[in-house]
Amino acid sequence: MHTLIRSFLGLWYVLGALAQTEIKLVADENVTLPCRHSLGHLGIQSLDIEWLSNISDHGKQVLLSYSGGQVYNAENHKGRYSFVSKYLEGDASLFIRSLQPSDAGQYICKVKNAGQYQWSFITVIVLVKPSELACSSEGAQLEGKNVTLNCKSTAGTKPLNYRWVRVNLKDNVERPVQSTARIGPENQLLLHNLSKTDNGSYRCEVSNEVGKRTCDVDVTVQSVSNTGILAGVACGVVVGVFLIFFTVWLLFHKKEFKKREEEEFFNEIREDAEAPKARLVKPGSSSSDSRSSQSGSSSTRSTTNSASRSQRTHSTQETPHGEQRHHCLEKI
């Protein structure tokens, strides 16, 4: 590296200072990469500071620089990188806002002052905390049955360490899980042959070197008899609701059927009352006598039985002949 620097500076006198550091930092936090320098006899007038990154396939990129009394930011990184407050007094450390896993890689601090160069190489390792946990219970929580408690972290720097404990949520006191419990191949907790003693809260803890996450799963074991009673009650409620709706439906349709019967009955009576009445009329009878005979005959039929009705009909038919003879005598 010294040979490369000498060839690059040509005839300049170079006092090269190299520093190599590896730093582990946590994602999503604001971090500072250290770089210190000493002002030469010319002071800040000959001071140049440059921060470069070597974290992509495009090679080295300038992130931040100071030259000629001005600070320059890379266009695509504005707002994320800056100098600390005393960069002109010997502290040229780089401030990075909200470190991301993609920021992992090598960073280079290059300071030139009065013909002297100072290099700092920093390798950044970004550590990620475990992600939020997804916890669940699988299986019927009944006496004698088996239940699986699942716990999963989808992100985080490996290795991720899983741990299950029982916890009293009132005072947050943890204690070991029962001896009959087993840890599955995917870090799930297996509870076999459940009993009332398995009731309670179970806590899953996932941790790595930079942080940890926890989640709780509740287990409430029910006896089979209680389950049968609850099922019977549920069925009874369903049947009861069905009977209520069926009774209401039946009463409604019965009322509608009765209403239709009454309407049909009154329609039949109305049709019978309005039907035309047939009668026999002899030729030669006057229209007035016919109307009088019809009115008398109709009145008589409405108040007598069938036998009387027949006799009156016969007498009514004979009356026109007598009246006709009477008119003939008057004419003579």
UniProtKB/Swiss-Prot annotation:
It holds the Pfam family V-set. Residues 320-332 have a biased composition (Basic and acidic residues). The chain crosses the membrane at residues 232-252. Residues 20-123, 130-220 form the Ig-like C2-type domain. Glycans are attached at N193. Residues 285-310 have a biased composition (Low complexity). Coiled coil: none annotated. Residues 20-231 are extracellular. Residues 253-332 are cytoplasmic. This is CXADR-like membrane protein.
